[in-house]
Amino acid sequence: MILTFEGPDRSGKSEISSALSIDLGIPRFKNKGEWLDDIKNSSYFVNTLTYGNTMLIDFIEQVQCDVIFDRHYPSEWVYSRFFGRQTNEQVLRKIDDKLAEMGAMIVICRRKSYNGIQDDLYSYIDSDALKKIDALYEDFTKWTKCKVLTLWVDDENLTREITEIKEWIKS
């Protein structure tokens, strides 16, 4: 199983993906290098997408391992559009096509309200920015060929969220 957790900042991705990883016994991967560069700067992200992510997909396919991602290529699709930064659209399409072919699934954690919520690292990602990012994730669901679950997280009920995801995976 290849399962990616996505969504605007402060939507519970890390907590939910960690809990599901433990519950299912599937390793979880989060690229901790994503915060080494300014998120408005395209160089790190476009290079990671073009070279790192394509190699990672080859690895997963060749060793046939299960993995849960805490952010992956959908973040590049969304945030490159949000910041107006350069990306590699051809590679985004190829990665999405390949992962869809491999049966990958994406859980997008979203809120119905972002009022009073602000990113903990970047103060300019405030409620208004999160609403725009959320709308881009909605656009992503129409673009991707992967199976997608929109998980509403306003109640912050981890037990319900894990149950809903596990039922969706089985369907």
Which residues does each PLM region occupy?
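Conserved phosphate-donor/acceptor-positioning beta-strand/loop module used by diverse small-molecule
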Residues: 69-72, 89-120
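Conserved P-loop NTPase "ATPase switch" module shared by AAA+ and STAND
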Residues: 65-77
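Conserved substrate/cofactor phosphate-moiety recognition/catalytic segment
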Residues: 8-11, 15-66
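Walker A (P-loop) ATP-phosphate-binding motif of ABC ATPase nucleotide-binding domains
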Residues: 2
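NTP-dependent small-molecule kinase module
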Residues: 124-171
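Surface-exposed cleft-lining segments at the edges of enzyme active sites
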Residues: 32-47, 74-87, 122-124
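Hydrophobic anchor at the beta1->P-loop junction of P-loop NTPases
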Residues: 5
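Well-ordered, non-membrane alpha-helical segments in soluble/globular domains
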Residues: 47-56, 86-95, 126-136, 162
